[in-house]
Amino acid sequence: MLCYNYTMKTISLIELSSPGCQICKAFEEFWKSIEADWPNVKYENISVITPEGQALASKYMIFSSPGIIVNEELFSSGGFDKEKFIVKLKELSREEN
């Protein structure tokens, strides 16, 4: 069995949501269910109806909610794949020594 020493990198996670969006709510619930496993992830939920949300939607060209932004890169818009999301977090978290 191989053993790796690594430090977990800090990851920025922004969910750009809109009021009444069921997929946004599903992502929030999913995130809450796995959040304890990812202490290195800084999660922020921003409403698209705020000035900050409007600026992010414009910057990342997000036309449907939720917009999932990971480390300042658009991961998905209008939906999300749980498995791909976790793979992305694992890839970004690992910093081999």
Q: Where do the protein language model's features map onto the residues?
A:
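Short polar/charged helix/loop
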Residues: 30, 52-56
